[in-house]
Structure formats: C-alpha cells, structure tokens
Amino acid sequence: MSKIIGIDLGTTNSAVSVLEGGESQIITNPEGNRTTPSAVAFKNGEIQVGEVAKRQAVTNSDTVTSIKRHIGEDGYKVEANNKSYTPQEISAMILQHIKSFSEDYLGEEVEKAVITVPAYFNDSQRQATKDAGKIAGLEVERIVNEPTAAALAYGLDKTEQDEKILVFDLGGGTFDVSILELGDGVFDVLSTAGDNKLGGDDFDEKIIDYMVSEFKKENGIDLSKDKMALQRLKDAAEKAKKDLSGVSSTQISLPFITAGEDGPLHLEMNMTRAKFDELTSSLVDRTKEPVRQALKDADLSQSDIDQVILVGGSTRIPSVVESVRKETGKEPNKSVNPDEVVAMGAAIQAGVISGDVKDVVLLDVTPLSLGIETMGGVFTKLIDRNTTIPTSKSQVFSTAADNQPAVDIHVLQGERPMAADNKTLGRFQLTDIPAAPRGVPQIEVSFDIDKNGIVNVSAKDLGTQKRTKITIQSSSGLSDDEIDKMVKDAEANAEADEKRKEEVDLRNEVDTLLFTVDKTLSDLDGKVDEEEVKKAENARDELKAAVEADDIEDMKTKRDALNEIVQNLSVKMYEQASQEQQGDQAAQGSDDASNASGDDDVVDADFEEVDDDDNDNQ
C-alpha cells in the first residue's frame, strides 16, 4: 500500500508530512525548505510554483497568491497567462508540486492524501478542496479540520481526561480561533471565529509602509511606485519581522534600492521590536475580538479552557503571544513548530486511515531494548529486548570531560548499536556535578519498568546524591510493525553497524590515549631525556594528524606506535626512580639503621617487583 501524505494547504504557505516510524516527518521542498509558498506564476509558457513564484509576486502580474481565500467561491476565476483559471485549478498546481517532491522523497508514487481546511469551511469549500486534489492526481482520503490536526500533532488525543482546547491560528493570510472539546479521543468543534483578511502578510505591509515613508522623507522618492524596489522591500520586511521575533532590534540594509539625481541611493535602517510593536499594535488588537467571540459562542469563560495551542508562523511574534496570554489567561503551548503542526497532524490522520496508528497493547515483556546514548554516539543497553516486566536495572557511568558540570541523559529504544539509529524516548539532564577530572564522578543511571509498561529513568550523582528522573509511557512508543522493522534492520545492517561501532570505540580509545599522554609528558618533565620526550611528542602529533585526516587505519598504526613509546618512557621513569631510591639508601648513616631497615623492607619489595617486571619484559 502506497503512503498517504498529509498536506496543510495554506493561504500563504503549505506544508506536507508523512508518517515514518510512527512519527510525522516534514518533507522538504526542492529548495530544502520545510514550507512552500502557496504561489503560482506563469512565465514564458512555464508554470512555476512555490519559492520561485513568490519571488516574482510583485514584478510579474501573472503571479497568483492567496487563492485559498476564494476556493469554493461560485463563479470566481483569475486571469493569468491569457487564460481564466478556477481556484481549484490554481490550488491543484500547488498540490501537484507538493505531490511531485513528495514522490522524490519517498521514492514511490503518491496517490492518496489527507488535506486540512479551516474549521469554518463550508461544504462547497471542502468539496472544492477535494476537487483540487483530484485535479492534481490525488485521491483525497479525508478532509480534516486544521485545529483538529494541530491538536493531534500536539498529542492531545492521548490525554486521559476531557479537555477544552483553544486553537489560535494566525497564518500568513488568515486568522482563525477554534475551541475544541476532546473526550475519548473524539474531537468536537464547539465554536470558531476569525478574520480571513488578517495574517502575517499584513504585519509585513506595516513594515513596508514605514520603510517607504521614511525613505521618502529622507530622499523625496516614493519606492512604492517602483516594482523592483517593492519586491526587495517585501522580502526585507518579512526577514525583519522574523528577526524581531528573536532579537530586540534588526538592521535593514538594501543597497542600490533606487537612483536619484546624484547617483545610486541605499536604504539603511535600524528597526527595534518596540517600533515594530507600535506599527502593528492595531493588527494585534484585531486578534482579540475573535478570541472573545469564540469563547462567547461556545458559552465558555477563560477559566473553562484547559489548553491554548498556537498554529501558524505569525504566532512567533512576541506581541501576539502576549496578547493570547492576556486574552485566555493561559500560557500558550509552543512545543510544536507552528508552521508545521497542521501538516504533521494531517499525516497522523493519514496513519489512522492506513492502520499505521492504533492503540498499542501493553505486553508483559519489553518489545525492544532500552538504554542510553554514551560517548561517541554509542547505544548502551541497560534492559534487553524481551525482558519480563516489571524489571529494573542500574549501571554507573562517568563524565567525558574535565570539570563537566552536567550530563545529558538521552533515553533510547531499539536494537542498533548506534544511538542515531534507534528511537528517542526522552531526554533529561543531571546538573550541578561538582568540578572533577573526567572519569571521576560516579553517575548511576537506573531504568525501572512497572507492570503497565511505564518506564521511569533516573540519574543520580553518587557523590552528592542529587537525582533527576523522567517517566515514559509505552503507549506513545512503537507498533509491532516498527519493532519487526527495527529488528530486521539490525540484522541487515549488523556488519555496517559493527564497523561504525569499532570506529567510535577507536576514536574514544585514541581520545583517552591523547589525554593520558599529555598528562604523562607533564609528569615526566625534567625526569627523562629530552630527546625521548620529543619522540613521544612527535608520535602524539602524528596521531592527532591521523584523527584530523579521519584515516582509520593510520589512526590504528599511530596509536600502537604512541602506546609503545609511552610505555618505554614509563619504564625508564620507574627505573630512574628506583635508582634514586637506592642512592638515597646507601647514603644513609648507620645511626639510622633501625629506621633504614624498616624503610629497606618497603624499598626492597618495590625494587624487587620492578626487577621482576624488567626480567619479564626481557
């Protein structure tokens, strides 16, 4: 059965996801981006979709954007390329583009899809969306409400109690607020409100207007009349908006934006977040009324809402987040990428349809090995596959660097020797480890699985007794098919895995050797012949060069050579130390005979032991 993809067909941007190994994976477009502009351009008889179309939205009049606003609108057509196109046809071109690069990613033909729509879409809008899919060569298995898809991606279907969820969706071109009631895994849309003429594009326009106004004040030229300049302003405004979501100010620099009487002119401007908030405050205010309306329509108050989740890239704007916080009285859940969350939920719904997503029956044995990632990306098992539960296991680990203040515990499930090839169950950190050389702190990692298959993992510093833990429920884990696949993968890749593990072990061994050599050379300073030390330093540098060159065979050769030199140095140091002790003994007076006798017993024992070692070596 071919894969069913999940598509978020957005007003400004679209995204596509597929279920792989039980998790939604966003499929990147040919430009390597995780979202694709919902734009279509016609140029020289060619249809261009996505990034390339967006870049000519201002300069090419045959470019169509935000077609989703008109889908299902009776009689509406756009004129482009000397033809008339329905919204379904334009949407189909976007879907065809998505279908094409999804097939390239999956390496197989894609025939089926789940497509999301706003909760307020009526039947004709939903049917038009299905028709667009059909035109694109896709069988639309299901039309899913965007807020429901978002809630699925946030994992809210797995909550045990009934919940009321407010979904705040501010995309590039539209704004929606939906309130869902969730009970027994069923989503019910209680109310929906919004503004389909409000989105991130409007925030961009405010910045563009400000730049045009400021440039006109300084230079007397209206950039809005220049299409090429306007396209550059549009790109710069979008970048500034994104920058100001993370930093308090950003520099807008557009050299050679236009030309005046005295030659070329440049636009240089610093924009602060405070200025951005001032320019866009009216837009943020417009998001408040739909939130209040949705609550009123659902006959709910702020206190009735259990969770608020954010959808759409524009929800990254700090002033928007603050407004949501005030209007709902809740801290918004921002744990999933807002640009991708709807597509990811659509892929989960696709998995439900194909039977890949279902409740996992808790077994009385652990289906796969459990462990943690250790130095070099190795998967160290603590509990083996098919171990009867309940069970528990502990193992002591240490730090990988001097004065390491914390350790990251990466909990994994699977059968492959390398951590990256197994499934991540969770991560947590043990902090405040007292400063000490590497290898000294004792960190005890414990796995405990109870009869319900719930995994508790803890890490304890045996020195300070400080402890942290994480709880992982197996119902969010792997299906039987995934387990079979992982076991087969482990068998099929055994040889390659073993080679990679050997390489990691070699690197760890070399790293430890280099650390030991540096310490030994420091201890030997002035105690052995300088030429011998130089020889060791050269061998050490050669090994470092082999590591940098990533030459495994050369690393082995240089490692063995360095080991031999260091061992010889150590022997010479002990011989020298023994001779010095003998000299000290001979110089002692007879008055100290009784004391010397006691000391001689110790010295002789040490000396004889060294002699034995020398004889063995000879």
Swiss-Prot record:
Residue segments, region Disordered: 573-618
Domain of life of the native organism: Bacteria
GO molecular function: ATP binding; ATP-dependent protein folding chaperone; unfolded protein binding
Residues found modified as Phosphothreonine: 174
InterPro entries, per database record: ATPase_NBD, Chaperone_DnaK, Heat_shock_70_CS, HSP70_C_sf, HSP70_peptide-bd_sf, Hsp_70_fam
Bias (Low complexity) ranges: 576-597
CDD domains per the UniProt record, alphabetical: ASKHA_NBD_HSP70_DnaK-like
Pfam families to which the protein is assigned, alphabetical: HSP70 (PF00012)
This protein's record includes keyword Ribosomal protein: no
Xref: PROSITE patterns: HSP70_1 (PS00297), HSP70_2 (PS00329), HSP70_3 (PS01036)
Record keywords, A-Z: ATP-binding, Chaperone, Nucleotide-binding, Phosphoprotein, Stress response
Regions of compositional bias (Acidic residues) in chain numbering: 598-618
Induction note: By stress conditions e.g. heat shock.
Functional summary from the UniProt entry: Acts as a chaperone.
NCBIfam families given in the database record: PRK00290.1 (NF001413), prok_dnaK (TIGR02350)
Homology family: Belongs to the heat shock protein 70 family.
Protein name: Chaperone protein DnaK
Organism: Tetragenococcus halophilus (Pediococcus halophilus)
Gene that encodes it: dnaK
